[in-house]
């Protein structure tokens, strides 16, 4: 069957087919078939679409190019698809030969579809006929999903030029567009960058001999019918919930049970989930929410609940004063996905045989690099690269690549180990002002300094604040080994360091408003301060941190009891005891320990006490693994037993005690008949 779609005065049919394949309800087809305007079976065009039971159709592209295209809409054959989220993991799983060397497969595809047909958000496709624009976009998609070979875009579409009779103007526009679509650097300066919440959908084919599809936009689960108004869109805001251990941002904290509940507004069902290694992404309608921790991971305490509000695509956090303020905590969607490196091939590096050169870069998602500065000087700088970042050395000791999470640089203070400032806002102001006047990109110079010197001066000025670097001890630092190479700086460069600090200390506000910050996936590496800001790459994150639960030492009770028996025993007599205590490592214990009758003071491992019949001394808080020696004195005229065993020396001993212990002393004294006398 067919539904009807209207384009002005022209009406065209939309396929209305129902799937016979369970779990694969979406119909994928090539709409370039009989009835298409100017259709010719001799032309090799394709115009792929997906729809659901005759719904509105959505523009689609295919990947896995060695497999079949979907059949034409007038074919007796039909291909059925399952809709999936357009995540990096799904792309990699479903693509046969993806181009993933830069780790940005999803971002590259999103960029192509944002700028390709039919979206064309930056006018790259302007002047190109629709079917030709589809051809360009499809080839750009294959470049990344299938690693298709494109060596020179100026020679692209040679076969199509003949088959489709392309004129020279169309051909030139197509080649230029293809070049811009596949090269991230070509679009880095365009006014409209890909938003952080931009999404699309993947369609997995039920028949593995046919290509999978991806849509040029996000496709709803329940699409409207042709001619129907789409359902009123409930604006939702993407938020990621991430769990960290306080003070450790090298990985996400897994295993906490969290609850997200909407307390004002509607449209969100309470969600209980476990924290994971990437964060929990949720789409939230406007309203007020509470994130609470139901169960922390072992060894951690329960975090304080976080109340936040979603309004007009903004996230507001309730602060300690009870006010809602805009959330400043924004992070990249995929944690620890950014690479950074120390460029050993930088011109001028070590050219004067001094090791003050600091050539650190982070890779932006558009393929460019930005200058970055280190933070926490005694940790590792970024891993080394000898080919300008094309290949970056892994960390052999940790057997992994060092990667970074890109976050907004609003709260640098919590990452600093030894900051000079004690106020977070002042600290951030000083860093921003150093960046105002410091080295930010290639070509920056200052006075007579080389670029390497200017860059080193900027790094040292940053260390002055982030690490409390002492500029007077650069040469004597670390047993005269010097402060991270800065001891080699000449007087002119050091003078610029002081100039930067003087500027940072004045009362004017920084010109730098925001900056990127990069947090490593290893606590052995320095975090990185960026010199650029890429807000479109960031998404709101609700970050909940768990404090490690205080370690409560395992302790034990020692109960010493006294029983006096026998026909002539004195049950009112107080018997004297001396106790010697040692820790698990054999050292004498000293301290005051609570008992059932006050406190027992132990000095150099020794204490004394008295007990009479029916009494017990219960000593609490003794460390696990301790040893004791208890000796009763002044009972030589009694038979002494300990825990039912004869103890003529009146002693009880035990080593490595790891549980509660009871030591029962019994003193017995009976009348013994004189020798030779008998009784009748």
Curated annotation (Swiss-Prot):
After translation, the protein is modified as follows: Proteolytically processed and assembled in pili through a transpeptidation reaction catalyzed by a sortase, which leads to a covalent link between Cpa and a major pilin subunit.
Where in this chain does the record put each CNA-B domain?
A: 253-311
This entry carries the following GO cellular component terms, namely: pilus
- Report keywords, A-Z: Fimbrium, Isopeptide bond, Thioester bond
Q: Report the locations given in the UniProt record.
A: Fimbrium
Major location (coarse): other
Fill in the subunit field for this protein: Monomer.
Q: What does this protein do?
A: Component of the pilus tip. Can bind covalently, via its two reactive thioester bonds, to molecular targets from host cell surface and can thus mediate adhesion of the streptococcal pili to host cells. Lysine side chains or a carbohydrate with a free amine group might be candidates for Cpa binding. In vitro, can covalently bind to spermidine, but it is unlikely that spermidine is the natural target of Cpa.
Name the UniProt record assigns to this protein: Pilus tip adhesin Cpa
* Species whose genome carries this gene: Streptococcus pyogenes
* Lineage of origin: Bacteria, Bacillati, Bacillota, Bacilli, Lactobacillales
């Amino acid at each position: 069957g067919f539904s009807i779609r209207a384009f002005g005065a022209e009406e065209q049919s939309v396929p209305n087919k129902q799937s016979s394949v369970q779990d694969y309800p979406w119909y994928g087809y090539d709409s370039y078939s009989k009835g298409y305007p100017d259709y010719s079976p001799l032309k090799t065009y394709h115009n792929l679409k997906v729809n659901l039971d005759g719904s509105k159709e959505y523009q689609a592209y295919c990947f896995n190019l060695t497999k079949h295209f979907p059949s034409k809409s007038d074919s007796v054959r039909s291909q059925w698809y399952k809709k999936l989220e357009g995540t990096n993991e799904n792309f990699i799983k479903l693509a046969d030969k993806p181009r993933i060397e830069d780790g940005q497969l999803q971002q590259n595809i999103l960029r192509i579809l944002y700028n390709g047909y039919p979206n064309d958000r930056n006018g790259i496709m302007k002047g190109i006929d629709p079917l030709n624009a589809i051809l360009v976009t499809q080839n750009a998609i294959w470049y990344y999903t299938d690693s298709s070979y494109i060596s020179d875009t100026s020679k692209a579409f040679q076969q199509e030029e003949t088959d489709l009779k392309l004129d020279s103007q169309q051909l030139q526009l197509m080649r230029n567009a293809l070049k811009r679509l596949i090269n991230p650097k070509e679009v880095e300066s365009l006014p409209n960058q890909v938003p952080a919440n931009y999404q699309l959908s993947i369609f997995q084919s039920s028949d593995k001999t046919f290509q999978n599809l991806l849509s040029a936009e996000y496709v709803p689960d329940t699409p409207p019918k042709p001619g129907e108004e789409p359902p009123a869109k409930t604006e939702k805001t993407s938020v990621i919930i991430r769990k960290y251990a306080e003070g450790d941002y090298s990985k996400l904290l897994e295993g906490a049970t969290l609850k997200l509940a909407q307390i004002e507004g509607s449209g969100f069902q309470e969600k209980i989930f476990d924290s994971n290694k990437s964060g929990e992404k949720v789409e939230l309608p406007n309203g007020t929410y509470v994130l609470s921790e139901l169960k922390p991971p072992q060894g951690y305490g329960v975090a304080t609940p976080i109340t936040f509000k979603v309004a007009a695509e903004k996230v507001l956090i309730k602060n300690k004063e009870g006010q809602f303020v805009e959330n400043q905590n924004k992070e990249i969607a995929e944690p620890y996905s950014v690479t950074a490196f120390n460029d050993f091939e930088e011109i001028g590096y070590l050219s004067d045989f001094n090791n003050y050169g600091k050539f650190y870069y982070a890779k932006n998602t558009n393929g460019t690099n930005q200058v970055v500065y280190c933070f926490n000087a005694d940790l590792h700088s970024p891993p080394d690269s000898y080919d300008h970042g094309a290949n970056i050395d892994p960390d052999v000791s940790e057997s992994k690549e060092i990667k970074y999470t890109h976050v907004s640089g609003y709260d640098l203070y919590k990452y600093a180990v030894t900051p000079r400032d004690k106020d977070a806002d002042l600290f951030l102001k000083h860093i921003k002002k150093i960046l105002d006047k410091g080295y930010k990109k290639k070509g920056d110079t200052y006075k007579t300094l080389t670029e390497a010197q200017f860059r080193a001066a900027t790094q040292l000025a940053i260390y002055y604040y982030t690490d409390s670097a002492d500029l007077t001890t650069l040469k004597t630092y670390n047993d005269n080994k010097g402060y991270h190479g800065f001891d080699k700086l000449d007087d002119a460069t050091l003078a610029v360091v002081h100039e930067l600090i003087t500027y940072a200390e004045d009362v004017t506000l920084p010109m730098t408003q925001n900056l990127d910050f990069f947090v490593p996936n290893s606590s052995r590496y320095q975090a990185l301060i960026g010199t650029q800001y890429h807000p479109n790459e960031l998404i709101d994150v609700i970050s909940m941190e768990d404090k490690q639960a205080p370690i409560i030492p395992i302790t034990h009770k020692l109960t010493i009891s006294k029983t006096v028996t026998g026909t002539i025993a004195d049950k009112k007599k107080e018997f004297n005891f001396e106790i010697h205590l040692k820790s698990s490592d054999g050292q004498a214990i000293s301290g005051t320990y609570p008992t059932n009758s006050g406190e027992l003071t132990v000095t150099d491992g020794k204490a004394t006490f008295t007990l009479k019949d029916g009494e017990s001394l219960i000593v609490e808080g003794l460390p696990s693994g301790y040893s004791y020696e208890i000796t009763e004195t002044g009972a030589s005229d009694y038979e002494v037993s300990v825990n039912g065993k004869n103890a003529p020396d009146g002693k009880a001993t035990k080593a490595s005690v790891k549980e509660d212990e009871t030591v029962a002393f019994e003193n017995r004294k009976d009348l013994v008949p004189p020798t030779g006398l008998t009784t009748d």
